[in-house]
Every structure is written in C-alpha cells, then in structure tokens.
Amino acid sequence: MLIYFGAAVKYEGRGMEQLSEFERRLMIAQGKKIERTQFTELSETKVITAREYYVPGDTTEATAFAVLATVGNMPKDNVIKLLNVDLNSSRAGALTCLKRMGANVETVSRREKNGDVFGDVEIKQIASGKRLQGRRFSEDVIATALEEYPLLAVAACYGEGETILRVPKEVRKEMRPKNEFLAVNLRKTGAEVGVYDDGLVIRGLETIVNGSDFDGGDSAQIGLALSVLSLALQNDEPVENMDKVEAMFPGVVDKLKNVLVAENAEKKE
C-alpha cells in the first residue's frame, strides 16, 4: 500500500503471499493459522503522493440484498440497486448462482480499479407466476461463494425442484458441522434439507409460511442468511445470537428491512 502512494519500500515475505486467493480462503475456512515472515526496508521518502485507493463493496452483503429482494415480499416495481459491488471472479460466484436459479439480477455497469473489478447490480422481482429453479452447483462454482453458501441455501429453500450445493474437497470436513447446524434451522420452514459430506441437497417449497426460532450460532454468515429468511417470512421474533452478524456486518439488518418497504432503494457500498 505504501508503495502505491510513492514510498520507497522494499518488502520480502513468505507465507500468505505465496498463496492464491482461493488457497487463503480455504485455509481461513479450515481455521488454520497462516504463518508468515517478512522483512521490510523503508528508505527516506521526501514526498508522498496523495492518490485515491478504492475498496469495492462486500459481496456477502450484496448477496443478502439480492436474496431478500428475490424471495421476500418486496413492493411491486421496486428496483434494488447495489452500487460498487465486488465482481472479482474469485468472489462473485453467489450472484452468478442466483441468476442461474432465475433471479432477476443484472450487472448494469462494470469498472476496474487498482486491479479490482466492481460494478453496479440491479435486482428486480421475478416475473409473476415464476419462482426460482433448483440447480446443481459444482465445487468450482461454490469455491467462489463460500462465504455466501448459507445465503444460497436459503434461496434454494424457495426453489422448484432440487438444488445441490457441492462443497470443495478442501473444506468439507470443516463445513460439515456448519451445514448440519444450518440444516436444522432451514428444516423449520418445511423444506427438505439433506446434509452430506460433499454439501447440501435442498428441495424447496413453492410457498413457505412457517419458520421461526432461528439461531445464528457462532457464524456471522449463517446468522445473516437466517436474518434474510426471517425477514422474508415477516417473522416478529428476532434471530438468536446476532452479535456476530452485527460485528461483521454493522447495521445490515436494518438496511435489509428497507428492501421490503422502500421504493427504488439504492445501497452505496
């Protein structure tokens, strides 16, 4: 980062820098500690150049808005516009999955800055009489949507037919207990949820009228997904153990509530 602003920095590192983005995410998901050593030499720099550095909006939050706008009782003709969403190929898999299921999700602009790809995404209601369709998603696709996995599972509960969400081999052992915990919550809706070593198999319902007493446990991602489900079901009871959700996604639940009431809602990332 300092080099980007003109500082004379020499850096040598070993550890995380030798890992790909996918490998880093897998190790984090596995709970492994990534050790690294580094050597930094900073020479005198007389002038630091002011430059703009932009960080795209979070993909997980964007996916939460997309799922709720798709399955929730959003006012007719509302358009949800998500600004500056991270569209890097290693992170945008969940939005692609939703589109394949039939969600009305469109990338209306795409930009690149500092090596990151980001853009604006619009979500509209599915056409009247239609619903999400069950799909099979391979390990390679899910590898780009690991943090959004619980949100895709919620969407699958509304899908027609069977949805298969295959987990990459490297994280199956670590994700199995999380998937079992998630499945306990999703089954409260009446959806059929099978938990297997290689992921979840979900047979959705045309209409979900039941479902409450959801518990986010110790996972911010599961808590966020269940919050989306609870809002879609218009539950009065809050999801339990939401502290981790608020810590990782501050204020997101209040913003999500606006999806169901605001017209032409626009969210800036």
List where the protein language model places each region:
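Short, structured segments at the rim of ligand-binding sites
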Residues: 1-269
